[in-house]
Amino acid sequence: MGSGYAKKKKEAKIMEQQFLEMEASLEQKRYEGQAGNGLVSVVINGKCDIVSIKVQPTCLDPEEPEVVEDLFRSAFKEAKEAMDKEMSVMRAGMPF
């Protein structure tokens, strides 16, 4: 096999290393979303795992639990959109 094969193999190894580094950094990244003027806050990492949830007691009404549910969904969506935006920039710089 010629030098073309060796070059491609080396490029593949570099790409694999870049991918592994990017994947490892995703767990360290944090994205926050808030809803209801900060009544609910959700923080996720770059793998979309929830890291923390904060709920202000003033929005906890046992008569209307759907309010907190809606705020949580909105806060999570905001955090995920921030993550997706950064991920698209990161992917644009990758050769694959």
Curated annotation (Swiss-Prot):
Main location: cytoplasm
Superkingdom as given in the UniProt entry: Bacteria
Localization per record: Cytoplasm, Nucleoid
InterPro entries, alphabetized: YbaB-like_sf (IPR036894), YbaB/EbfC (IPR004401)
A GO CC annotation given for this chain: bacterial nucleoid
UniProtKB keywords: Cytoplasm, DNA-binding
GO molecular function: DNA binding
Family assignment from sequence similarity: Belongs to the YbaB/EbfC family.
Self-association state and partner proteins as the record states: Homodimer.
Role of this protein: Binds to DNA and alters its conformation. May be involved in regulation of gene expression, nucleoid organization and DNA protection.
Protein name as annotated: Nucleoid-associated protein CCA_00330
Higher taxonomy: Bacteria, Pseudomonadati, Chlamydiota, Chlamydiia, Chlamydiales
